[in-house]
Amino acid sequence: MNILVIKSSVNEKKGSYSSHLSDLFIKFYLEIHPDDQIEVYDLNQFGLANTNLTMKNFEDKTFYQKAESDFWINKLRNADKIVFSTSMTNFNYSATTKNFFDAITVPNKTFLLDKNTGKYTGLLKNIQNVQILTAQGAPLGWYPFGNHSALIKQIFEFLGANVRSDFFVLDGTKVAPNNQKPIADFVAQRQNQIKILAENF
């Protein structure tokens, strides 16, 4: 199995809750599947992190080149499963995540549109499962309009991926007493849930 791990938090250098989740998930997964191939990418280390879609670069098509669209699409095509992590930023997923989805959501490469019927068909059917791991400062339910985890799931499904795993949200990271604990300690409180997700992935 080829497992593609994508990290997309803007807090990687300070310490990211969602990346800690991802690392713990992969640790548990490798205990069960030691021979699987794991590729880990922090999107912040690539050009797309600072390349957003604009009127100009959409019209002249330079966005897709600068964001290395084909590189990421090929990574997705060659993956059997995806582990995707990001944090909530201003009620949504990070801008880096938005850039990533703009780069990979490309007609005739990752989806087809039948203009006669209006039907969309995702082309990334090779992806057998996607584990979405997210973090947010607020407890669940504080911002019902900000369901970034569900949106990520729906985008992968639109592109043809089979998302069998439930997404996992580490919530309340910015409220007391959680915000007074080291990141690793707070994440460790949920490790039993993460282990179960890894076992079922």
UniProtKB/Swiss-Prot annotation:
FMN binds at S9, S16, Y17, S18. It catalyses: 2 a quinone + NADH + H(+) = 2 a 1,4-benzosemiquinone + NAD(+); N,N-dimethyl-1,4-phenylenediamine + anthranilate + 2 NAD(+) = 2-(4-dimethylaminophenyl)diazenylbenzoate + 2 NADH + 2 H(+). Binds 1 FMN per subunit. The keyword GTP-binding does not apply. It comes from the Bacteria. GO terms for molecular function: electron transfer activity; FMN binding; oxidoreductase activity, acting on NAD(P)H as acceptor; oxidoreductase activity, acting on NAD(P)H, quinone or similar compound as acceptor. NCBIfam families: PRK01355.1 (NF002370). Homodimer. Quinone reductase that provides resistance to thiol-specific stress caused by electrophilic quinones. Also exhibits azoreductase activity. Catalyzes the reductive cleavage of the azo bond in aromatic azo compounds to the corresponding amines. Belongs to the azoreductase type 1 family. This is FMN-dependent NADH:quinone oxidoreductase. It comes from Mesomycoplasma hyopneumoniae (strain J / ATCC 25934 / NCTC 10110). The lineage of its organism: Bacteria, Bacillati, Mycoplasmatota, Mycoplasmoidales, Metamycoplasmataceae. The gene is azoR.
